């Protein structure tokens, strides 16, 4: 009889974990995307100030008002200066993810991540986002490999990489690895309160 209750408890715990990730997954993506866009906007605005590329700013803003933002940004990319061109690529990837075209979104972020002309900060953000929007049938080990450097190197993306990596570990059925990542996240300073609370909750739910 005890075995039956243990199985029920495990099923409930698994359902709770799935519900938490369903609830927070989109929020995580939105938060990271917002950070990337804000930083990129700052770079784009600085470029506009120094080069007086007002036409680039107008072209970008006009594309955002289009019924087909992706097509408009793709068509107008040649008019954009470096800062706005990068921002456009991030926007294209975000639009693709919003349209549930996760394969295209992942490819767009990977293109940014491999662009050596970009500041490493943006390359790292793109690499993280490529994992977060990857299709459900993507190979977990390959996704985890993209996060390995971000999880260990101090920087603005480390906490988010650890949280994302913990989710991948859960998908792979490796509860111990997931708990270890959540604990590392909890030990970090300056972790957003919401993220810390999620990590704490997951540690409790995973029974550690």
Model-derived regions, located:
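Soluble extracytoplasmic domains of inner/organellar membrane proteins
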Residues: 89, 94-208
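N-terminal positive-inside, membrane-proximal cytosolic segments immediately preceding the first
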Residues: 1-34
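Transmembrane signal-anchor/signal-peptide helices with a preference for the extracytoplasmic
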Residues: 38-58
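Short, charge-rich, low-complexity alpha-helical interaction segments
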Residues: 28-30, 51, 58, 133, ...
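Alpha-helical membrane and juxtamembrane elements of multi-pass inner-membrane transport
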Residues: 2, 11, 15-18, 57, ...
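Short extracytoplasmic
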Residues: 58-91
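Repeat-mediated protein-protein interaction surfaces in helical alpha-solenoids
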Residues: 36-45, 66-77, 105-112, 141-150
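A charge-rich, low-complexity, intrinsically flexible signal that marks solvent-exposed coils, linkers
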Residues: 8, 50, 54, 70-72
């Amino acid at each position: 009889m005890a075995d039956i209750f243990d199985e029920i408890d495990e099923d409930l715990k698994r359902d709770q974990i799935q519900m938490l990730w369903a609830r927070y997954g989109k929020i995580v993506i939105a938060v990271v995307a917002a950070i990337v866009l804000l930083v990129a906007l700052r770079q784009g605005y600085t470029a506009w100030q120094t080069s007086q590329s007002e036409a680039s700013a107008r072209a970008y803003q006009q594309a955002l008002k289009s019924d087909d933002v992706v097509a408009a940004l793709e068509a107008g990319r040649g008019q954009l200066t470096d800062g706005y061109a990068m921002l456009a690529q991030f926007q294209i990837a975000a639009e693709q993810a919003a349209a549930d075209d996760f394969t295209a979104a992942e490819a767009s972020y990977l293109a940014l991540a491999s662009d050596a002309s970009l500041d490493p900060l943006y390359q790292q953000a793109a690499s993280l986002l490529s994992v977060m929007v990857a299709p459900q049938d993507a190979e977990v080990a390959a996704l985890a490999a993209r996060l390995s450097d971000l999880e260990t190197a101090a920087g603005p993306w480390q906490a988010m990489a650890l949280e994302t990596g913990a989710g991948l570990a859960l998908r792979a059925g490796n509860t111990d690895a997931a708990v270890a990542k959540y604990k590392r996240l909890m030990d970090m300073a300056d972790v957003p309160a919401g993220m810390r609370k999620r990590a704490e909750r997951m540690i409790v739910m995973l029974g550690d």
